[in-house]
């Protein structure tokens, strides 16, 4: 089952609880895939406004996924629009106030219905104020499921490009910086509804209107930026289905790319 279909069936009842008609659920109106930023507070939620458009351009160029490019800074807030997005990014570099219980419940419902959240810190450190605030809220959403490192054999690392494997052990998650060589997250069985990166992937993707990279990538330069794009593409491909069979995921793509090298 596609994640889009799963969200459509699973969230009609949620909209009813919110007092919204089923027609408010826009999933399915446009089969093209898109992602947005989560506006989680009044300030500091949009530190990398150009990044997602650049990522989706690469997704469309390298895969068969049809993309609906978002405008720079496209976002959703806590409310019915949340349930029109199968995948959201959350970025920042400063702390934010605790969410209300209603917002915690809404995020939990969205994730448990198939929503996929990627948290990407712009801070360049492993335990800055943004990530501390995020972890505070995720602990409320997942009180019985602590954050942990995503194992190297998880399908996220092979949904399109191969990472963390014997042939390419150097190919690890990267971003604008190298803070943590592991992605982290919370699990719902085998599924990972939320991924946490401290490496500022969005900073590596951000490009201005003249085509210039907005941030230097440290320490690896262009190869590190390429690995960051590949990780982003893997995350998008993971978001497109509710569950993957680890031994069958995108076999034609994987066979084609088993000998890839970063130039």
Write out the residue ranges for each language-model feature:
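Extracytoplasmic/secreted envelope proteins and their assembly/folding machinery
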Residues: 49-56, 104, 108, 131, ...
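N-terminal signal peptide c-region/cleavage motif recognized by signal peptidases
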Residues: 21-23
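Charged, often glycine-rich, active-site loop that binds/positions anionic groups
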Residues: 82-92, 160-169
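Alpha-helical scaffolding within the catalytic cores
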Residues: 71-77, 100-106, 179-181
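N-terminal secretory signal peptides and thylakoid transit peptides that target proteins
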Residues: 1-14
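An acidic, glycine-rich "communication" segment
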Residues: 32, 43, 124-229, 233, ...
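Short alpha-beta junction capping motif
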Residues: 35, 87-131
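Aromatic-Pro/Gly-enriched surface loop or interdomain linker
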Residues: 25-87, 94, 201-202, 209, ...
